[in-house]
Amino acid sequence: MPKIKTVRGAAKRFKKTAGGGFKRKHANLRHILTKKSTKRKRHLRPKGMVSKGDLGLVVACLPYA
């Protein structure tokens, strides 16, 4: 049986936590930041968690995480 390939883009975007979840970065903080309020940008700064509905897709992309 050949090894399962990891999706490299997913490996760079998600980090597994001790509890089995995955950390992720929030979207909308790369460019066009002048029109976004400081509060909005501040709330986008900390890491988020992958939602329960998307967890299966992330696990399939990262077989060895």
Curated annotation (Swiss-Prot):
GO molecular function, one term: structural constituent of ribosome
PROSITE patterns: RIBOSOMAL_L35
Disulfide bonds: none
Protein name, UniProt field: Large ribosomal subunit protein bL35
InterPro entries found in the cross-reference section: Ribosomal_bL35, Ribosomal_bL35-like, Ribosomal_bL35_CS, Ribosomal_bL35_sf
Pfam families in the cross-refs: Ribosomal_L35p (PF01632)
GO cellular component: cytosolic large ribosomal subunit
GO terms (BP aspect): translation
Native source organism of the sequence: Pectobacterium carotovorum subsp. carotovorum (strain PC1)
Similarity section: Belongs to the bacterial ribosomal protein bL35 family.
Record key words, sorted: Ribonucleoprotein, Ribosomal protein
Taxonomic path: Bacteria, Pseudomonadati, Pseudomonadota, Gammaproteobacteria, Enterobacterales
Domain of life: Bacteria
